[in-house]
UniProtKB/Swiss-Prot annotation:
This is Alpha-1-purothionin. Keywords: Disulfide bond, Plant defense, Secreted, Signal, Toxin. Residues 1-16 form the signal peptide. Residues 62-126 form a propeptide. The keyword Signal applies. One of its GO terms (molecular function) is toxin activity. Its main location: secreted.
Amino acid sequence: CLLILGLVLEQLQVEGKSCCRSTLGRNCYNLCRARGAQKLCAGVCRCKISSGLSCPKGFPKLALESNSDEPDTIEYCNLGCRSSVCDYMVNAAADDEEMKLYVENCADACVSFCNGDAGLPSLDAY
């Protein structure tokens, strides 16, 4: 779980910058990149890939409109992350204690990921 989120975050930093019009587009792109190709995810989520230092006009990287659906979007991102990544870890755990630890750390990573916290501490710490 944490490795997957770490790889997604690392890909976002190494590859071209993804520029999205909204938080919904940003979350869509981030979740899609867990399995999808950069160009595919950008197209599906209506984002653009920029190799420059800034995003094209109309595609702010993480800017939100004042009346955006940010809380709902973040909640859906958290639910999607937890159900697709953290639930998988339940089956991988050897015992109840290990499962509890995995799920707790995974849930924390999902919250940070969905809130756009690019300054995550090293995921190896989990």
